[in-house]
Amino acid sequence: MSNPSRTTLPFHKLGHGQRILLAFHGIGQDGVTCFQPFEAQLGKHYTIYAFDLFFHGKGVSMKSELITKQFWQSILHDFLAINNIERFDIAGFSMGGRFALATLEAFADRIDNVYLMAPDGISEHPIYALASRFSPARSIFRWSMQHPNAFLGISGFLQKAGLIHASLYRFVQQVLDTPEKRQTIYNSWVNFRALRFDISALYQKASTNNVSIYLFVGQYDKLLKPAAVRKLAALLPLDQYIVLKTGHTQLVDQAAAWICALFK
């Protein structure tokens, strides 16, 4: 494990508002492209620190190693101190949801609002668990990323058989179409596996610290179904679980518009 004090994440500073928002993007993205809608709609309310997470964007060359909660807490602790940030809000989309949850767990006493958009980390898909948690399976997963034709062929067969949705198949094709993207997927799946959460305990911690959690899902999202976030949704007030009429790719934009209404 690297020395956290020597590890910094690149970030993009967006907006000019008085409130602070730490924002964590989805897989295969970077901070600025993911959170441009937040800058456009919320930039007058927030100064947004949109991070390039490990193995993504300007952080693509970071060493492949397991990211633990303690490691993440140390990195953010240093970031907050250097930038003189005391209180803040957080946002996480898709993969970035894991980092939003890890941030909430570590800094609940300094957070006011959490915006989770189709977040990873609420539950764990069996395929992810199989591919990332066991050494033999990780070896097979690594091989499949180095030799993608078989993997894509099986995915195509499942799509034609109606076992996976066409939009999910297109997403798989898009995120695996270059060796660099496949390496990013492998590094992220394997190295983020320690970011797991007891959702009931985390919600209790948020409630104790008066943190408001807003959970957004897309009605037409085929990548993250509502069942994947049911554990958290069941705990939230009805007006903080928001189902938007959109799919996965437009969810950040739609959520930004919804959040903007909170300031009116």
Language-model region placement:
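Conserved alpha/beta-hydrolase catalytic His-Asp/Glu region
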Residues: 146-207
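Conserved HGGG/HGGXW glycine-rich cap/lid loop of the alpha/beta-hydrolase fold
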Residues: 14-60
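Gly/Ala-rich beta-loop-alpha elbow adjacent to hydrolase catalytic centers
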Residues: 92-96, 100
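Flexible "cap/lid" loop of the alpha/beta hydrolase fold
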Residues: 105, 114-145
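Active-site loop/oxyanion-hole signature of alpha/beta-hydrolase fold enzymes
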Residues: 49-91
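Conserved alpha/beta-hydrolase "acid-adjacent" motif
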Residues: 222-228
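Catalytic histidine-centered segment of alpha/beta-hydrolase-like enzymes
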Residues: 244-256
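Short beta-strand/loop motif that positions the catalytic acidic residue
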Residues: 209, 215-217
